[in-house]
Amino acid sequence: MADSLELVIDTIMAREVLDSRGNPTVEAEVLLEGGAIGRSIVPSGASTGAHEAHELRDGGKRYLGKGVLKAVNHIEENIAPALCGLSSLDQATVDSVMKQLDDTDNKSNLGANSILAVSMATARAAANGLGLPLYRYLGGPMSSLLPVPLMNVINGGEHAANNLDFQEFMLVPHGAESFREALRMGAEVFHTLKDLLSQKGLSTAVGDEGGFAPNLESNKAAGDLLMQAIEQAGFKPGEQVSLALDVASTEFYEEGQYCYGGNSYSSEQMVEELAGLVNSFPIVSIEDGLAEDDWDGWSLLTKKLGKSVQLVGDDLFVTNTLRLQRGIDENIANSILIKVNQIGSLTETLEAIELASRSSYTTVISHRSGETEDTTIADLSVATKSGQIKTGSLSRSERVAKYNQLLRIEDELGSQATYAGLVGLGPRGSLKG
């Protein structure tokens, strides 16, 4: 067991590195007195909610304005002096000090990217100092639930240069006995889908999250393709592998109307469109089915589908306890997407997860479209017993890195490991029983 002095923060460094889109992002390193090091890199999103914490960029010509040297500077000149000498074990204090230093509601002074990088690196340094895996350090000895992956195998919207309006069409291999088997099932459907696309003369180029990005005549056509791929891979749709959608509807919401596919829909009509898809396909989860500030529309959607489908708020809640509490109070949605960089610190992320859990909302731990080799979210999904993770398709190493980390965790847990399966999917899981 490490001496408490060995776990005191000694040095904090930062640098500008690249994410999976070739854009700069922030990496932080926290060195403890005893020699343990924690390193973390923050992700960034393409379809970002208006209520997310502020990601600080440099502007100007360098990296087309997307440099992060200001954020790196803030870490080394403002954050490091304030944190050195504190215990890495006191995550809440570390994050609170940074929040006070920033002194804005959305972290626009220091930047959520600088605060989060240090926050996550501190947790990893503490875990390394104690000789514990990160999931065990964050979650304790009872953390043994492996999440169901929501695998984004067809990309559209802001994640791909194609004509699909909905952003993600996902596989959900809930019928597996283990995470390892779930990953295999997803990979087999992914490769079958690639063959199907090739046979139809469609593009097999991949989007930001590693899924295919073909031009298709409609969102329904994407669902039909996935059903065909699941069956041809030898699995039963709805029993072993189901579907999930990220509509990302804020991206095509204009003046109170949802405009896509050459048509405009009111909130009521959009709800009926989604209900029609649920009737046509084994859809277990819909994310951002309505826009981030269309609270009345969300209420209609929840009344229509909330007892049969997981309704996930991403742009709606932005990992923010204030917005989540409003959703809970108004019975809106039944699940929250958890993105660490939406709120900008590990402590606030854990608070959002705790509030959701207390209120019987499911949680889905999620990557961003601009990702890195950092695997923190894999450990976080196990630590928090979330039961679900979104980390892209079965290609691109920044996506696969998280899957591989979950394989390692499952191996390490051995007979203690439990795969969440259908139970992890909230209302749909309880109905299927």
From Swiss-Prot:
(2R)-2-phosphoglycerate binds at residues 167, 339, 368-369, 390. Mg(2+) binds at residues 246, 287, 314. It holds the Pfam family Enolase_C. The active site is at residues 209, 339. The keyword Lyase applies. It comes from the Bacteria. InterPro entries: Enolase (IPR000941), Enolase-like_C_sf (IPR036849), Enolase-like_N (IPR029017), Enolase_C (IPR020810), Enolase_CS (IPR020809), Enolase_N (IPR020811). HAMAP family: Enolase (MF_00318). Belongs to the enolase family. NCBIfam families: eno. This is Enolase. It comes from Prochlorococcus marinus (strain NATL1A). The lineage of its organism: Bacteria, Bacillati, Cyanobacteriota, Cyanophyceae, Synechococcales.
